[in-house]
Amino acid sequence: ERSHYTHLTLLAKNNTGYRNLLKLASFAATEGMYYNPTIDINILREYSEGLICLSGCFSGLIPKLLRAGERDKAEEWAKKFHEIFGEDFYLEVQKHPITKWSEIPRIRAEQEKFAEGQRIIYEGLSHISNKLGIPMVATNDVHYMTQDQSDLHDIYLAVGDGKKVFDESRRRYSTDQFYFKSEKEMLELFPADVVHRTLEIAEKCNVVIEELENPKPLMPH
């Protein structure tokens, strides 16, 4: 349903993929707009050539199904994506440890829910990977560059929602781990082959964006 949108990671392998990515983005922002830009599986299939697909973050379709206890449905969607993208589909695994537990009951409950959700997702994706032979790749859900910017990001969230920083009911992230981690940090969280699969994906991406002779948009008279 359009009201239950989820996240998906798409990367361009080549110029065909780049053009298809632009088409998908344009469709999502126009015909697919429903509070947020969206696409459905049929449009994704139509413009899938030249694209690499990762299953998404905590809010991805497959992770959401796993958190809801619907592993069979999660497997079915993994099969669908694998049918569309073949060897260019990867199960995206993430770990964002809770480094500081809140003493505020409401916030701590959210942290506990997030931590348990991550555990369920990782176990579920590992099971699907082993069962279907779909490779996993480790990523980090990056929202700021360095760990010490987490407080600024928290303020940004409060300002964006028009609420006070100390408002317990406002939107917030459960940990300060949503930053750009080093290879060493990622290897402390995941098996080496899962981390280094990012290099395999990077080597697949060979987009060459040609410089336009006249980059100015054409305006109707």
Question: Predicted regions span which residues?
Answer:
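Phosphodiester-processing cores and adjacent nucleic acid-binding clamps
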Residues: 1-221
